[in-house]
C-alpha cells in the first residue's frame, strides 16, 4: 500500500530507529509498502521512518531492487564526492552534499540472510542517504549552515505543511 511520506518537522524523522528483531509477515508487509511508496513517488530509495515506522529498514532500487534490514556501514572511503541531493521528506529542496565515494554495508535481506556488499558512486550516495534516515539524520543536516540559512523559508514552510498533515490511513 502506498503510504504518505513524513515531512521535515515530523518527530519520527529525528529518532534513531530500532533494530528489526525478526523478519516476519509484518516486516514483509512493511517492505512491500516501502517499495510501492518509493515507486509511486519516483524515489530511488526510501527508509521506514519516512512512512512513519521507526525501524531499521530501507529499500533501494538503483537498477537492482534491494532491502536493507538492520544495516551497518562497515567501511567508508576517505575519497569524497560532492553532488546534489534531494529527499521526499524535504520536498523541492536540492543541495550539494559531500559523501564518501565508496561504502561497504553489512545488512540482512528480506530472506533473513546476512549480506556484505560494497557500493560506489551514486549507489553509495543513496545508501548513505537512506542509512542516515535510520540515524535520525536528514541531508539538510550535512549542508553548510549558510546554505540552511539561505533556504530557511522553504524549510519552515515544509515544517508547517508537516504539522497540518493528517497521516491517518483511509480505507
From Swiss-Prot:
Spans traversing the lipid bilayer: none
Positions bound to Fe cation: 87, 129, 133
Catalysed reactions, semicolon-separated: N-terminal N-formyl-L-methionyl-[peptide] + H2O = N-terminal L-methionyl-[peptide] + formate
Pfam name, any one: Pep_deformylase
Textual note on the cofactor: Binds 1 Fe(2+) ion.
InterPro entries in alphabetical order: Peptide_deformylase, Peptide_deformylase_sf
Gene3D superfamilies, per the entry: Peptide deformylase (3.90.45.10)
EC number(s) reported in the record: 3.5.1.88
Keywords, in A-Z order: Hydrolase, Iron, Metal-binding, Protein biosynthesis
Active site: 130
Cited function: Removes the formyl group from the N-terminal Met of newly synthesized proteins. Requires at least a dipeptide for an efficient rate of reaction. N-terminal L-methionine is a prerequisite for activity but the enzyme has broad specificity at other positions.
The family this protein is said to belong to: Belongs to the polypeptide deformylase family.
Name of the featured protein: Peptide deformylase
Species name: Pseudothermotoga lettingae (strain ATCC BAA-301 / DSM 14385 / NBRC 107922 / TMO)
Phylogenetic placement of the source organism: Bacteria, Thermotogati, Thermotogota, Thermotogae, Thermotogales
Gene name tied to this protein: def
